[in-house]
């Protein structure tokens, strides 16, 4: 990061990132991506999960802190597997851990914005924003735009399904316009709702 920062133009921001506690935990337990194997979810013991998540919170904050000290202007927290969490556990496994990390970064680095990406929480996105209070929120392509609460101070980012990059140009531009038109009166960073497909 220090080397990149030195070569980066002054008007360009450097974004650091980290996985959120739940997402790191899924990789640890599953020994890899849970994309095709979610059997591990059946054997989770809530008390043990919370204990590990609390430990990860601390380590992730340190990781983010070191990135900021090395030159990162912004931090993005990726909770890529938040969509696997049952609603009854969402607050303890996703909302509270992200909130704790965001709050600590805000307190110690008030000039460094934080973006959160709780992928897959869909109907619970408004509550996540209200509770966690990030500066920015990345949304995935399954979010119902009409149900988003736009009456808050958060900057929205993303949304477009990457599959449209593989289709014809007309559909791709129409999909892009859908997001640009929806957020036209709101601070918005156009982006995909997840990674680029191969």
Residue positions per predicted region:
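Active-site loop segments of alpha/beta catalytic cores
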Residues: 2-198
């Amino acid at each position: 990061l220090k080397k990149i920062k030195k070569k980066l133009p002054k008007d360009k921001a450097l974004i650091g990132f980290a996985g959120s506690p739940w997402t790191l935990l899924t990789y640890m337990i599953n020994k890899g991506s849970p994309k095709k194997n979610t059997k591990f979810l059946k054997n989770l013991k809530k008390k043990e999960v919370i204990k590990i998540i609390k430990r990860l919170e601390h380590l992730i904050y340190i990781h983010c802190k070191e990135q900021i000290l090395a030159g990162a202007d912004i931090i993005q927290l990726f909770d890529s597997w938040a969509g696997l969490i049952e609603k009854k556990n969402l607050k303890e496994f996703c909302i509270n851990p992200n909130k704790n990390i965001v709050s600590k970064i805000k307190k110690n680095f008030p000039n460094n914005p934080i973006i959160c990406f709780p992928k897959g929480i869909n109907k619970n996105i408004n509550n996540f924003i209200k509770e966690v209070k990030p500066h920015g929120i990345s949304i995935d392509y399954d979010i119902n735009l009409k149900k988003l609460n736009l009456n808050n101070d958060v900057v929205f980012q993303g949304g477009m399904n990457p599959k449209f990059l593989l289709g014809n140009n007309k559909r791709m531009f129409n999909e892009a316009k859908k997001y640009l038109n929806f957020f036209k009166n709101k601070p918005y960073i156009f982006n995909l709702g997840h990674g680029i497909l191969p």
